[in-house]
């Protein structure tokens, strides 16, 4: 009897609570859906940190594996705090100086008149992007940069360099009063081919130049010595993780649970597949062998290239963008080797070169409203003329000047201070033991002539 009485009281209480609650409106349901989807997308983007760590570790030597892992986890940790304390305000605060700078006070600026669920969700998602821009550089400076210098770089990029250029192109994501000067021209970069990847790629180029090549990379006759990574298995797993993460990176950039996310996921995947195949074929022709590392970088190149236009192009255009990216990444790797810029993982070729290509591709392939796309500007190949391409070129050019210039200034300052590059003895022995007193593979013995 007591059990039935208790059940009745619970049912009555639940009924009264339900009676007091107002029914959810369509707007409330959509807002909650947007929050859930954006959080899921942000978590997917976070998995890209693991992808980058595995790619960089696999493409470099075993004696530096722990150092690579340490750099990747620490650039996320210090970068997230730097973006929270200062970067978010610079990127999404109210526009100052005609859209050249944002400011909303230290800490996370408010988007809704006070801290709310959407504010937290939005800035969680954007923090993942800031961390991605910072970690791109790790591979290009691998096996020779001092750990403390890398920490300094990570803080400066996440707190200052990335947010300032990000405001120019994405400031209005926080509201109309935050519009940057480049986006006011009509510039379009949906998920960050330039805002994220080119920024990281240009800084990676600056770092590789400032550091110089690894010991033994180039012979006296100018030809490059191959320095193979120790695990193509780790590298492949890393690329697959990045590929998965990109389904949060691109579709998640709507920050809304709407039907268009399916189209963006489709164009993203097609470009990645096309990039993989194009890089494989190009490397096969040039090198005489179907090279796995080139195919893997082709996947990433296709993903980077489609990131700017994934919401504005057709599936056929996505394939073309990916094919071009796959060819470019292979030719770019050989080009940088030819001019003695040592990039152990091909970060500059993947993120800088194809970030530029992907951003310009918006001005070529942006589809018109007649095909179901609500674009204000139409690409050159659809009769839109050169205006859109010109606007995209402005964004690419200004980002190159800012990111490369600031990156080079940071790395050269560290070099002048004598803390940028490890000693030759440390480099030859490996950074795991010398920098961290640890060995990533303590139970294994590796044989190497370098």
Describe these PLM feature segments.
Residues 1-20:
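N-terminal secretory/membrane targeting signals
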Residues 19-450:
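Glycine- and aromatic-enriched membrane alpha-helices
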